[in-house]
Each structure stands twice: as structure tokens, then as C-alpha cells.
Amino acid sequence: MNRRTRALTVLACALLLPLAGCTTEHTDRPARTPDDTIRAATLTLTDRCLTRQGLTPPRPGQRPANRAEEQRVAAALFGRPPAELSLTLANGIAVRAHTDGCLAAAQRTLYGDQKRWFQVSTVVNNLKPEAAHRDLSLASVRVRHRAELTDWQRLRSRALDASTRVLHTTSH
């Protein structure tokens, strides 16, 4: 098989392989983890948002047309400065996020309360560093942040339900 034939074969497989499962029932697919479900819905929502603005959603390995396009996509996806949400961690590092942009809109759709999700997810994602910084056990830091952990579970459960709906409406 020469290089050209091999390249065409690979291209054909790449184009047809995604269609191979199109006739199977949804139950034949492996179940997504909750994290994968939320990530997939977030990607779906951010892609829709960018597309509505006439922008091409970024993909791994795909380069933007030019620097200006890359900046437009980044601003639309992540929001424009200044960041409206901020939380200072136990170690003094400030974490910031935007309330505008496609990612923020997706978070509002999935979690309901973007500001509270930002606060609790930042705290929960930094429990181990806080324990190390304060020289405390992780268990004692978890007790200290019981309210944030409870809210994290509630908001994440809401996001999982919303994500399932987003993906269900996308697949039909």
C-alpha cells in the first residue's frame, strides 16, 4: 500500500468511524461518569455559545486562524477583564473567575448559582492544600468546610441533572 492510499484509508476511517455507532441504541454506549457527563454538557453549551457568536469552538490540536481570532475566542469563552468573582485561599492565593463569557453562561445553566458554585468548588478543590498549609488533617479541614461540601454536593447534583437534559436534547 503506497503512502497516498494509506493516507486515504486513514482519512476514510477517521471520517466513517464516528458514524459506526449511529444506529445503535443509546443503552449500548458505555455509561459516562458524572464528571464526564458534566464536562460533555459544558462543552456542548460553550460550543453553542461560541457558534452563536460566529466563532469556531477550539479543539485540541487545532490552531486558530490567527492571533486576533484566538483572542476573540478566548474573550468570548472565558470573559473579559476584570474578573468579577474572587476568593482568597488559606495560603493567600487569590482565585478569580468571570461572570461573562460562554463558560460562565454554561455554569449558570448547569449549576444554577454560578457565584456559589465558584465559591464552593474553589474551597472543595483546595481542601488538601489548605490542610497542608494549616498543618491540619484533611478530616479536620473537611469538618471546618462542612457547609461548602454540602453545597458542592447539592450544586453538583443539580448540574448532573441539567447536564443529562442538555445531552439528551442534543442527541435527539
Please place each PLM-identified region on the residue numbering.
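Mitochondrial intermembrane space
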Residues: N2-A12, L16-H172
